[in-house]
Curated annotation (Swiss-Prot):
Keywords per UniProt: Metal-binding, Ribonucleoprotein, Ribosomal protein, RNA-binding, rRNA-binding, Zinc, Zinc-finger
Subunit architecture: Part of the 50S ribosomal subunit.
Phylogenetic classification of the source organism: Archaea, Methanobacteriati, Methanobacteriota, Thermococci, Thermococcales
Function: Binds to the 23S rRNA.
Organism: Pyrococcus horikoshii (strain ATCC 700860 / DSM 12428 / JCM 9974 / NBRC 100139 / OT-3)
Annotated PANTHER family: 60S RIBOSOMAL PROTEIN L36A/L44 (PTHR10369)
Name the UniProt record assigns to this protein: Large ribosomal subunit protein eL42
Molecular-function GO terms, alphabetical: large ribosomal subunit rRNA binding; structural constituent of ribosome; zinc ion binding
Gene Ontology annotations for the cellular component aspect, listed alphabetically: ribonucleoprotein complex; ribosome
Annotated positions binding Zn(2+): C11, C14, C71, C74
């Protein structure tokens, strides 16, 4: 899918439509010090198998895109709804 590098959309911080720069964001590594991760490590300790049953069905073939829109006026970034699944993604100059 081809997506423009710049797009005119609503900025929730300026409260008006401005030109936004589109950025694709990569996922950061999961924090090992978060409360949930510490709890999970505690459950895994000791003898026995994995504490949860295997998930049913197969894994999705493609991850969802994480797009950030950076306002050229105020410089703040925001997302626009939820991400969508796409196999190939390319930012192009329009």
């Amino acid at each position: 899918m081809k997506y423009p590098k710049q797009i005119r959309t609503y900025c929730p911080y300026c409260k008006r439509h401005t030109i936004h720069k589109v950025e694709r964001v990569k996922r950061r590594p999961r924090s090992e010090l978060s409360a949930g991760q510490r709890r999970f490590r505690r459950v895994l300790k000791g003898y026995g198998g994995f504490p949860r049953p295997k998930p049913e069905g197969r894994e999705k073939p493609v991850k969802k895109l994480d797009l950030r829109f950076v306002c050229t006026v105020c410089g703040r970034a925001h997302t626009r709804g939820k991400g969508f699944r796409v196999k190939r993604f390319e930012l192009v100059e329009v």
